[in-house]
């Protein structure tokens, strides 16, 4: 019951909040308006390297490159749900665990958080 309430509350807040990229339209897709969501530099293929499939959601181009950099280095945590949902939308094969890449203790002290640990917890 509490989970349902939280989901409804989140949807309500999202429907009146501005898009995280353009700030103009209302959020419709994981914190973005439909125009910004459609204009993300989607990568619609798998990359094969050394007989392994590598899944990648986007080309590292604007605006996704800015989203990643500001989330990672400028503590803009409002992007955490967007990045987690983009990864979830990859339709990953059945996995048993998601393991964030560890960062050095110095980087952790500098940033104050492990950005991928936050995303892994959301996923």
What are these regions (language model features)?
Residues 1-123:
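Glycine-rich phosphate/pyrophosphate-handling loop used in enzymes and phosphotransfer proteins
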